[in-house]
């Protein structure tokens, strides 16, 4: 009988019920995959992510944990707004249709979700809570509004957080980001900078790479803030530096375009720079304009020119730098461009300037290139010697740092400072499809929070997307409202929250049955025990979520600082790329068709699956052709979860063959499998029968049936023990390898004489494959007479007595050449071992011609003739 995966999978998907259990012996286990944006279709990356989490959830449930394994939808965002404009539909309707489609797709994979906890962030009963959070953050001083220069995406027509700018481009649109000055709402993530940094070390089950990325993004720097007097103005320029010892090598200062000083110097040149400037500029060009101002050097009788430069960021430190071109690559390039002095001050620095400098200085135009060995941070050491530096001459760098700080503090123009690269999170977005910010602006009362009893502030449905910009800002009625204080006409805030606001707390909403934030439920289920998602979220989502936990704890919602205990960053699903003779990207099926027609195509490298390069495979196609279990097994089989995996049609075929092989094997052995009690309990209680211990002279020959079965039983239980350990440590590909090995082992057993062992092996095997291929496992469970659902059965435990090695394999050599192997009792007496070895090769050697026999216990016997 052939395995009918289509009917089997539908049958069990309609009957599974993964409601959260109560009072489980092992306590809670919260498993969560990063929830998806409802684009309308799942892709292979989704499939891998969700199946990894599903295996963990099913295993933990079998181990007796109260498993929370929810799913929801990160439903706000610009794509819905774009779809509304392009297709003349409401974003809510477009989003709901996509959610319905994707929900059906997820159910077709057989994922063990607590569907009763499903949520969507675009629903008012969800986002009303985050509006309340915002009001509480206001009370706690964690929110403020100010006018600031922001990153403006000209394609998406909205503000981007710095974390959303990648190499000067918008993270979603890819457009070159511009600078604009707007009034924005900010969350004070910097209040928790030190705590966010320190607590990284306690996240023992996070990948080191993720922790390193967050460490660098928070960017703690210990240095000095120096005040430079601006010549001709009664103002001072504050500069933060981690290298005060290079102050005598300074040849210029530079400020960011947003610096307050610049606002007083709005020459046409500076205005042109501001209007055209990009973050770091195209190709990281260092662009600057001389302001016409100079600053006084703190110790020398000279002035340094003050520039406005595009590489200086207002958000970082003081928005100003002093440039030491001899010991900084960026400053060197700027000095070359603007012909500024280059003054070396550290004798053993490995920054080579061409032509060589004899402890003097050159201007930028005289220097043709630099040589940097081993990277900039290694250009000099703390033991390098200072020169060209007045009172620092002859000191080591380490000594010079201390002395220069003391001198600056004595003069009252410098102080030790700790700075962070991290800046406050701007959450205002100029778009419709997002959570409304609950604030009202009144000409009499100023900024007024929406009263809690008036929450939620919901979105209007009668909006116009055809005129561009933010529809809320142009709405004829929604925008206008009476002030809660004076009752005069006022206006709503028309910006909406950054969508990362919603995803920064959704894991807490899942803890409660009604999607609210129940303190007891949150403290009970949080933190998330296993969080699975891509490493691309290492800074944005994960850092914001850590901040939100601290902010919500401060507001009294729960008492959890860290949201995620174990973080699994699954690798990408990759596929070979194809192009036709004209360089046009081809879908794999198109490439296959052209090849069969004899056409020439270009086979490219293996890359992450992407729509743009057409190297995608539709999960629905695989599920329809091979079944959900085949798709699940393939994405888990050959590659550790954290590594990228390559799509392979042969691999999919191999997984399909295994599933059918397992079905046929169990059907073959079905008549001998008798379940008198819970088979899993039967397996767990199995011990070695006394007669199985018997052997002749320590050897287990093939004719000794019970002895042979002892070996099989040991291997099965060792595989069970090993794969259980692999599951505990998320080595899922190793689990697959072990249960495949177990399958082959059971298939070798003689059905006539090994009925009890087959019964035991089949019971173990069906249970351990269930987290991976649950539909087939449930079907096999039913076929062998199992009662109820398999996923509700406990996990089998390997018998400890079967894990002890009392038999070893010994090599038998004749004159140094391997001729046989034998299985003998461990630590067998050497004389017995020698005799067994001679007997095992009796067809190869005449015992009367044996001159000597040498034996190493438990390892080898060498017969010399």
From Swiss-Prot:
GO molecular function terms attached to this record: aminoacyl-tRNA deacylase activity; ATP binding; leucine-tRNA ligase activity
Q: Which domain of life is it from?
A: Bacteria
According to the UniProt entry, where does the motif 'HIGH' region sit in this chain? 36-46
TM stretches of this protein: none
Query: GO terms for biological process?
Result: leucyl-tRNA aminoacylation
Q: Where in the cell is it found?
A: Cytoplasm
Enumerate the UniProt keywords alphabetically.
Aminoacyl-tRNA synthetase, ATP-binding, Cytoplasm, Ligase, Nucleotide-binding, Protein biosynthesis
- Output the Gene Ontology cellular-component terms: cytoplasm
Q: Report residues binding ATP.
A: 611
Reaction it catalyzes: tRNA(Leu) + L-leucine + ATP = L-leucyl-tRNA(Leu) + AMP + diphosphate
Entries under SUPFAM superfamilies matching the protein: Anticodon-binding domain of a subclass of class I aminoacyl-tRNA synthetases, Nucleotidylyl transferase, ValRS/IleRS/LeuRS editing domain
What positions carry the motif 'KMSKS' region?
608-612
Which InterPro entries does this entry report, sorted A to Z?
Answer: aa-tRNA-synth_I_CS, aa-tRNA-synth_Ia, Leu-tRNA-ligase, Leu_tRNA-synth_edit, M/V/L/I-tRNA-synth_anticd-bd, Methionyl/Leucyl_tRNA_Synth, Rossmann-like_a/b/a_fold, tRNAsynth_Ia_anticodon-bd
Q: What is its EC number?
A: 6.1.1.4
State the family it belongs to. Answer: Belongs to the class-I aminoacyl-tRNA synthetase family.
| PANTHER family tied to this protein | LEUCINE--TRNA LIGASE, MITOCHONDRIAL, LEUCYL-TRNA SYNTHETASE
Q: What is this protein called?
A: Leucine--tRNA ligase
Q: What species is given as this protein's source?
A: Wolbachia sp. subsp. Brugia malayi (strain TRS)
Name of the coding gene = leuS
């Amino acid at each position: 009988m052939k395995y009918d995966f289509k009917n089997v999978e539908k049958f069990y998907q309609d009957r599974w019920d993964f409601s959260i259990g109560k009072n489980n012996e092992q306590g809670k286990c919260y498993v969560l995959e990063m929830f998806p944006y409802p684009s309308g279709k799942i892709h292979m990356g989704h499939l891998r992510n969700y199946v990894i989490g599903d295996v963990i959830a099913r295993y933990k449930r079998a181990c007796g944990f109260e498993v929370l394994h929810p799913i929801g939808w990160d439903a706000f965002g610009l794509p819905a707004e774009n779809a509304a404009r392009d297709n003349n539909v409401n974003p809510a309707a477009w989003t709901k249709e996509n959610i319905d489609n994707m929900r059906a797709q997820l159910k077709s994979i057989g994922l063990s979700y607590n569907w009763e906890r499903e949520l969507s962030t675009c629903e008012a009963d969800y986002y009303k809570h985050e509006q309340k959070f915002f009001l509480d953050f206001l009370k706690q001083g964690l929110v403020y509004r100010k006018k600031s220069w922001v990153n403006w995406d000209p394609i998406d027509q909205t503000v981007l957080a710095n974390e959303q700018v990648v190499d000067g481009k918008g993270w979603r649109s890819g457009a070159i980001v511009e600078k604009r000055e707007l009034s924005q709402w900010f969350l004070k993530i910097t209040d928790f900078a030190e705590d966010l940094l320190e607590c990284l070390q306690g996240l023992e089950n996070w990948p080191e790479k993720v922790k390193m990325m967050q460490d660098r993004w928070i960017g703690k720097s210990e240095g000095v803030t120096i005040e430079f007097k601006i010549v001709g103005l009664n103002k001072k320029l504050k500069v933060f530096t981690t290298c005060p010892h290079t102050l005598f090598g300074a040849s210029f200062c530079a400020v960011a375009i947003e610096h307050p000083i610049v606002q007083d110097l709005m020459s046409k040149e500076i205005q042109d720079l501001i209007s055209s400037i990009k973050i770091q500029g195209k190709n990281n060009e260092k662009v600057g304009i001389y302001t016409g101002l100079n600053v006084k050097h703190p110790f020398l009788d000279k002035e340094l020119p003050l520039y406005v430069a595009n590489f200086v960021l207002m958000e970082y430190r003081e928005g100003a730098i002093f440039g030491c071109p001899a010991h900084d690559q960026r400053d060197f390039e700027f000095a070359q461009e603007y012909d500024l002095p280059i003054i070396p001050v550290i004798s053993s620095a490995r920054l080579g300037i061409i032509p060589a400098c004899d402890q003097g200085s050159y201007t930028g135009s005289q220097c043709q290139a630099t040589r940097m060995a081993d990277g900039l941070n290694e250009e000099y050491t703390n033991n390098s010697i200072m020169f060209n530096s007045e009172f620092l001459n002859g000191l080591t760098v380490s000594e010079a740092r201390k002395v220069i700080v003391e001198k600056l503090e004595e003069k009252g123009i410098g102080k030790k400072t700790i700075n962070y690269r991290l800046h406050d999170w701007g959450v205002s977005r100029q778009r419709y499809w997002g959570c409304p910010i609950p604030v009202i602006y009144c000409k009499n009362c100023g900024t007024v929070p929406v009263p809690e009893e008036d929450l939620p502030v919901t979105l209007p449905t009668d909006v116009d997307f055809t005129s561009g910009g933010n529809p809320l800002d142009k709405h004829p009625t929604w925008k206008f409202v009476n002030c809660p204080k004076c009752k005069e006409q006022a206006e709503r805030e028309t910006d909406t929250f950054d969508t990362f606001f919603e995803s920064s707390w959704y894991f807490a909403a899942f803890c409660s049955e009604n999607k609210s934030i129940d303190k007891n439920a949150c403290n009970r289920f949080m933190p998330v025990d296993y969080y699975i998602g891509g490493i691309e979220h290492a800074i944005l989502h994960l850092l914001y979520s850590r901040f939100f936990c601290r902010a919500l704890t401060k507001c009294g919602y729960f008492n959890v600082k860290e949201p995620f205990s174990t973080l699994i960053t699954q690798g990408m699903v990759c596929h070979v790329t194809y192009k036709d003779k004209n360089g046009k990207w081809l879908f794999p099926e198109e490439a296959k068709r052209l090849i069969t027609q004899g056409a020439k195509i270009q086979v490219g490298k293996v890359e992450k699956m992407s729509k743009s390069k057409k190297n995608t495979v539709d999960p629905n196609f695989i599920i329809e052709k091979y079944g959900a279990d085949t798709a699940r097994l393939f994405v888990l089989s050959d590659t550790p979860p954290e590594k990228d995996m390559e799509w392979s049609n042969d691999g999919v075929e191999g997984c399909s063959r295994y599933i059918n092989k397992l079905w046929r094997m169990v059907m073959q052995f079905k008549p001998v499998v008798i379940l008198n009690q819970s088979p899993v309990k039967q397996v767990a209680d199995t011990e070695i029968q006394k007669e199985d211990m018997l052997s002749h002279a320590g050897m287990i020959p093939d004719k000794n049936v019970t002895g042979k079965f002892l070996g099989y039983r040991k291997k099965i239980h060792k595989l069970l023990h090993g794969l259980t350990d692999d599951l505990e440590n998320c080595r899922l590909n190793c689990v697959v390898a072990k249960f495949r090995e177990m399958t082959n082992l059971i298939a070798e057993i003689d059905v006539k004489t090994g009925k009890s062992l087959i019964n035991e092996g089949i019971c173990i095997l069906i249970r351990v494959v269930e987290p991976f291929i649950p539909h087939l496992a449930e079907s096999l469970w039913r076929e062998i007479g199992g009662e109820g659902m398999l996923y509700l059965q406990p996990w089998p435990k390997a018998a400890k007595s079967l894990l002890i090695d009392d038999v070893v394999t010994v090599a038998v050599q004749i004159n140094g050449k391997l001729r046989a192997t034998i299985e003998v009792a461990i630590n067998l007496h050497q004389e017995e071992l020698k005799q067994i070895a001679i007997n095992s090769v009796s067809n190869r050697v005449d015992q009367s011609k044996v001159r000597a026999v040498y034996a190493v216990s438990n390892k080898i016997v060498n017969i010399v003739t």
